[in-house]
Amino acid sequence: MKILSPLTVCLAVLLSAGCADSLKSDYQPPEVKYPANWYQADAAEERMPFDWQAFNDPDLDGWLRQVMVRNNDVAGAVLRVYGARLEEERIGITNDPGLKGSLALDGKKQLNSSAHWTRGSVASINTSYELDLWGKIARQRDAKAWARFASEEDLRSARLTLLSNASNNYWRLGFINQQLSVLQQSIDYAKETLRLANARYAAGGASSLDVVDAQQGVLSQENRLAALKNERLQALNQQAVLLGTAPGSAIVEPKALPMGPLPQVSGKIPVNVLRHRPDISAKEWRVREALATVDVQRTAFYPAFSLTGSLGTSSSSLIAFLENPVGSVGANLTLPFLEWRERGMDVKIARNDYEQRVLEFKQELYKAMSSIEDALALRHQLLEQETLLREGLELAKKSERLNEVRYRQGAVRISFWLDAQEKRRQAELALYENRFNQLNNLAKIYMEFGGSASFP
């Protein structure tokens, strides 16, 4: 083993800094085109289209907090982040100076003589450290750091998706319970209509067909009620899945949809909105990780240079070792470029993986732009639809009243009145469905804009 002078070691360290920079690739974000209606915003400008607290629903906020704590998907994402941090720490430990020690004691005695026992000892301490001449270790650390950042963004994305799913479950239960309430009222109304039809038939003022039509109306509403009760049970089971528990223990069940003012959405879209989306950020960090991996494979062409040191002795007494140790410093040189074909293939494979991730990242950007535009367009459509549905509901109520009067006067058969009841009921349910869709659309918009650090 060759002994190194301090000057040689210093020169090696200086050489390491220069060579490492020359083999480090600079990350350049891929060029993308943004929609013409998106504007360039300042970094400090608020990017969220509305504040989540504008829903003004404490029960919803409490439900979301419970889900965030107990959901298994989020718990799994937390563990993956922890695993990525451990991988990053392991790279640092692996490349720290290694230290090994050994101590051996032995005794000898000739069996055919009366000589005393001869005791001996061998002790040594060895250390080794690989000089990062080409930046290989630094790029390995970078790759693990980028992977950890991507895992952290995956956690944010999991929480944001859970926010949307849990909100949808909450509003879905409210929507179902509201439909149940409407249908129960309709059943009571249909039974009253049947009673009236029976009375008119008994008095000779109506035919038996009116009675049959009224009976069919009652059965139809009761059948819908049974189907809705099953939907409610499914929604409650989904709630248990979100909470990571067994079905059968409902935590929150709104009796109706919130009918108060909804959050106002800003139609302005800043260009930097995509930078705050966790799914986009995770994709970009993985692109950077792949680029760092390319650099690691490129450095494999260059020789690895490690410093070694040892301290030890061999004597008939351990005390002698402690009093007179022998130390040495040396260097080991490995030449991986002798396997140049295999190394070249590793670089090409890493480069191919990097280019794939770049394309996936660009595609994810364009998909995100489209999703944002679709969500905002749907918001505009739902608002227009709400206005038309309210007008339609008023007309349906008016038609129902007129047909009831005409039936009581004997001007029309009961089927006209029953049809008018059904149209009024469908118009009322359509308006509630529009409110349900608006709530889900708002959660979708909130998620498409990347959420915020303060969401429940």
Short names for language-model regions:
Residues 16-18:
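C-terminal motif of bacterial Sec signal peptides marking the signal peptidase cleavage site
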Residues 76-91, 158, 162-185, 189-199, ...:
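Amphipathic alpha-helical coiled-coil segments
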Residues 207, 226-274, 413, 440-456:
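Short, solvent-exposed, mixed-charge loop/turn linkers that connect secondary-structure elements
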